[in-house]
Amino acid sequence: MSDGKKTKTTVDIYGQHFTIVGEESRAHMRYVAGIVDDKMREINEKNPYLDINKLAVLTAVNVVHDYVKLQEKCEKLERQLKEKD
């Protein structure tokens, strides 16, 4: 979507309802929320003693870690492509 038009949708993350607004499609926002929900549940299985705030922060740290690793991999591939030219 990303045409500047705002889309509003309600999602469920870890048993809580959130209304989110973005420029992406509702399907995309639900997909992203589903990933967050899955990650929170995955971390909770390994750390059931965490309160919701610590679980949310640990989830954010894990997701950003994954993002940084993918970003580094992308940059490495871009460098390799430039070296071939």
Swiss-Prot record:
Coiled-coil regions, chain positions: 58-85
Alphabetical UniProt keywords: Cell cycle, Cell division, Coiled coil, Cytoplasm, Septation
Location relative to the cell: Cytoplasm
Signal peptide range in chain numbering: none
GO biological process, one term: septin ring assembly
Domain of life: Bacteria
Alphabetical list of SUPFAM superfamilies matching this protein: Cell division protein ZapA-like
Record-level GO cellular component terms: cell division site; cell septum; cytosol; plasma membrane
Pfam families assigned: ZapA
Summary of subunit composition and partner proteins: Homodimer. Interacts with FtsZ.
Protein family per UniProt: Belongs to the ZapA family. Type 2 subfamily.
Its biological purpose: Activator of cell division through the inhibition of FtsZ GTPase activity, therefore promoting FtsZ assembly into bundles of protofilaments necessary for the formation of the division Z ring. It is recruited early at mid-cell but it is not essential for cell division.
Name of protein: Cell division protein ZapA
